[in-house]
């Protein structure tokens, strides 16, 4: 799908996507702030300083196309995919559905296409939906992670709620306890908040700090002639004063990709790869550092696990027009609608359609290599105590198992957490300080999903 939308309409839509009110932090957000806070103290240790230096170097190499990191596409094509991914299809996960494969991706996108409609004499974009049930599930999950992402950006940029209003004493204590200071990236990379060429709030982005930034042009999501600079400095999107950490696009990309994985479990591993690609594409654009992407991934995965566990403060909360009391049941209801819609469009059982794939996600060896490279982006160990020690997921974050059981019902929660423990990535990263939140930075849902699928009793009988 390609749409041609007037620049005025596009700017308005970008405003809708990027601007939302930031409220005072809630009780559920304090653990999120605490979990992401280790970045603020990286300059206090030699290991942390080395990680900061590597973060800039890795980011620059990926953005410039000089990295040895495997990608799903040749670099020029990956750049174009990154430009396409700059637009958030938050209403229906349309832009991420290509991870479902050739057949199912086309079927999903045919059911959720975008159209331009006239309302009150103005052109507006209408996002198609599988069903109201699916739309509600997506909106509720996105609202949860979006609120967390918005708060964390300002908190880690200048220690405020919205750029100006101070945070609570409890939130401030999070930084005090670890000797943390906001604007870590701005200060570390020579662009402290408010200085020439810097973000006015803090945590300037790579396009503001990299010694060499690669600008490129192409067609965006709407098929319009554009380029990465247009989505960094305007007019399509202006991120000059939008703080870097954590990546909001990555948070969205993982949340919606994982929702699609849960809705279509046959494509769970590939949807995790799609999420990883979406996050890595933010580095290619010059919008984010590797640490931003890792932070966004961890935030989305953590939030989704809390939703699936029906944790108080996550469910039964009003998000706009929607309120969900039982997220797992809402997911089950939505899956029934998605399955019917996809089978109707594809013309075959969903398992057969899932296997019909000629997309960039069809090569498992390529998926393996690329996804593995994004687990840590090669950043060095910061927390030596957790580096060589597997984290006990069941003990630290037992709700994480729902990320598997919600898709693969033959698993018990204990079995799911055992798989997550066995497949977790390397430890000791900049978020892996031994906390419950930190363990989410180690989860390897790609390998975990593969093991879960292999454990299907129906497969074992064949």
Segments and roles (model prediction):
Residues 1-11:
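Bacterial N-terminal signal peptides that target proteins for export
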Residues 19-21:
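N-terminal signal peptide c-region/cleavage motif recognized by signal peptidases
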Residues 25-284, 313, 322-326, 333, ...:
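Hydrophobic alpha-helical bundle signature of multipass membrane enzymes
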Residues 244, 287-350:
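Extended amphipathic alpha-helical segments with heptad-repeat/coiled-coil character used for oligomerization
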Residues 343-362, 366-371:
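Extended ligand-binding clefts on enzyme/binding-domain cores
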